[in-house]
Amino acid sequence: IEKKQLKKYIDINVTGNDELLQNALEEKADDRLKNIVATIQDEQNKIIRAKINSPLIVQGVAGSGKTTIALHRIAYLIYNYEKEFKPEEFMIIAPTKFFLNYISNILPDLGVNNVKQCTFEDFAYDVIGKKLKISDSNEKLVIIVNKEFDDINKGKIDIMIKEAKYKSSIKFKKIVDDYLLQIENNYIPKNDFYFKDYEIMSYNNINKLFKETYKMYNYNDRIKEIEKNLISELKKKSLLIIDDIRKKRSKELQNLTGENRIKVFDKYEKIIKLLEKDYKKIVKQYLNQISKKDCIQYYKEFIDGYLQNSDEVMIYLKKNTSNNLQKNEISFEDLAPIMYIQYKIFGIKEKCKIKHVVVDEAQDYGEFQFDILKQILNSNSMTILGDIAQGVHYYRGIENWKKFIDVEFKNVKTVYTTLNKTY
């Protein structure tokens, strides 16, 4: 109230005492934002304010305000958890670039900046470290939708659907896990670490470091830790080794004269200087035995060499994926396994490390896509919004929320709610 005139009102039954939502009604906000905030319903508001720690899953019919909830939940969480989380540690995964353009205009008006906004494909590029050629999912969708009118290729299309579903499943992830275990068992050199004739560390001890001591790290970071251990061990033993080398040199030089004596002396001196000055080089020579592949090469090896032709779906999967990889092309469903291989072997960049993710139109993603998000989050802090009835890429997506929760959040307290009213 200003000069006995009502200038503004706020329904505290909806917005409560949060300055964030109240400020969103200030004059600087455009009419679109005011309309959004003004129409938030009580049931939507309860979802917006749900605690951050548990996974929140919202099944909402068309027009129930899922996107409004997604945007306001991000704003609410950032404001109320500002001491625990930075805005850049939040991420919204949207289905299309068009949708991203829409929310990028709304979030700043809610006082939200620096939140990562991307499609699943964009996030995959960040995790993998390079942009990949992805076949158009819409072309596949057109083929699948027209299946009933294509009697000739109906059987092949059915297998295509099963392949996409299988690649997006937790079952496929478990096969990738088995493959990664095989890589882990063969990752480090099988030989002991020696300097000349001197054992510095046995294979068994190095393997124990790799598989037990540093198992919490990705494979690449484990090697970095092992490198430190090997350098340290080499330094410890270097004085004794140098002393022994000098004794050998003296013994060998006793019966030599002239040029032969100089050659032998120089040979031993070179070894001593290497040991005194270049521990890293010696250790690197040992670790250079480790295979130099990237995540795409590992995925090719997985498809071509590890997967078994157990049934017609797997035969099609192997052939189709292998042909695409030879053309440097992948499908959307290949992103999750490639991301997973990258994450487990090489880790991810700092910019990919997030603490809470909001996924809109979640019904179009499969179990494997959600599982890799959980791995990267290293927690269950997710807001998942979708509508099973509105699945566009239903052939690879979620069919049943209960089954999805049982797979992805088993033994985890999960908040599941439905919005059945269109506003």
Regions found by a protein language model. Name each.
Residues 1-23:
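N-terminal accessory nucleic-acid engagement/regulatory domains that precede
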Residues 70-71:
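Post-Walker A alpha-helix
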Residues 78-358, 364-372, 380:
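Alpha-helical nucleic-acid-binding subdomain
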Residues 66-67:
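Conserved lysine of the Walker
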Residues 376-423:
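Conserved RecA-like helicase ATPase core segment
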Residues 52-56:
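Pre-Walker A (Motif I) flank of P-loop NTPase domains
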